[in-house]
A protein has these predicted regions:
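Cytosolic regulatory regions built on CNB/CRP/Popeye-like sensor folds
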Residues: 1-270
Length: 270
């Protein structure tokens, strides 16, 4: 992290402002996660596959790194300053304390959003490879297993049965996201095709934001899944303090992708 400087934040001396020169890496994919960040000045690139594929370019007000802090504990992407940049650094222990006192449904949402982001990153890597198809697998000891363990251990959600893609689309169009507990499906995004099984997350970021689910889904073997009511989850999120609301908003923005509408999450609670 050569060239990176830290100093107390003028607005909150308990936190640090981090200055990152253009081209310098703040953290790399696979690093242990000990903080999240909010861009104050400049631009930050978020990339996967050892920095070879850029997922997003973040500007002032955007948050990043929260997914690893609350979900996987290890960085899922590489953050590099696209220009000279200044970021507010928020330690993992602060975020952990905020989440530990939050309602159980919020903890469930964080774990499931982490899985959805890992899934999105994997599909993005397929789309930019020669293969064009792959299978998202929850690997033992990996970040997805950590998030799945947290989700399945604490879940008290209702379960639904879907025999085909139409049944899944009906759930999503009714504002319910699905987290697969058994069965198998194929998700198609553009030219990329991805097989998914246990731990697949469909539409959570979308129902929180109140925006359409754009991917096509085929059921390969009948699916049982937990359902998350988007309106109920959003109502809970909207009552959070501004800091945690911003974390959820940033999370959803990463999952939906650069340039996509944040829908009702674009508004800020008073």
């Amino acid at each position: 992290m050569s060239g990176i400087e830290r100093r107390p934040s003028p607005s909150n001396p308990k936190l640090s402002e981090v200055t990152i020169p253009a081209g310098v890496v703040l953290f790399s994919e696979g690093d242990r996660a000990d903080a999240m960040y909010i861009v104050q000045q400049g631009e930050i690139n978020i990339a996967i596959n050892q920095g070879s594929h850029t997922l997003a370019t973040l500007e002032k007000g955007a948050s990043f790194g929260e997914q690893a802090v609350v979900g996987t504990k290890y960085r899922m992407a590489t953050a590099t300053a696209n220009t000279d940049a200044v970021c507010l650094e928020i330690p993992a222990d602060w975020l952990g304390r905020q989440i530990s006192t939050a309602p159980p449904l919020l903890k469930t949402v964080f774990s499931a959003l982490t899985l959805q982001l890992l899934q999105r990153n994997y599909i993005a890597s397929i789309a930019h490879s020669d293969a064009g198809a792959g299978e998202f697998v929850i690997e033992s000891g990996g970040p997805a297993e950590h998030a799945w363990s947290n989700f399945s251990r604490g879940s008290t959600l209702n379960s639904v049965y879907c025999s085909d893609g139409g049944a899944i689309q009906n759930q999503l169009q009714s504002g319910r996201a699905l987290i697969v507990s058994s069965g198998k499906l194929e998700l198609r995004r553009g030219s990329a095709r991805c097989a998914l099984g246990e731990g697949a997350v469909l539409g959570l970021a979308e129902v929180l934001a109140g925006v359409p689910f754009d991917d096509a889904v085929d059921v390969l073997s009948s699916v049982n899944a937990w359902a998350v009511d988007g309106d109920a989850a959003y109502a809970l999120v909207f009552k959070l303090n501004k800091g945690l609301y911003g974390v959820v908003k940033g999370f959803v923005g990463r999952v939906l992708g650069d340039g996509k509408s944040l829908g009702r999450l674009a508004q800020t609670p008073q």
